[in-house]
Curated annotation (Swiss-Prot):
Residues 56-76 are cytoplasmic. It comes from Homo sapiens. GO terms for cellular component: membrane. Coiled coil: none annotated. Disulfide bonds: none annotated. The chain crosses the membrane at residues 35-55. It comes from the Eukaryota. This is KANTR integral membrane protein. It is a single-pass type I membrane protein. It is found in: Membrane. The gene is KANTR. Keywords: Membrane, Signal, Transmembrane, Transmembrane helix. Residues 26-34 are extracellular.
Amino acid sequence: MSPFSLLILVICAFSLFFLINLTRGLSILLVFSKNQLLALLLLSIVSLFSISLISALIFFDLLPSTFFGFILLFFF
């Protein structure tokens, strides 16, 4: 495993941990809030942003190895 892959894995793990804690806090806010629609919107935005960030990090980690594999496939 390359150091870059390890870094991506650590970032994804901490992002997931942060997302779980933030979701727990926002769900408590949703229960006690008078404006539940705003709290639900915040929860949705944070969840989508975190999932897209993790997906982008995984994609950019796998992209160079996939590109290198295609180069090897076409030239050798």
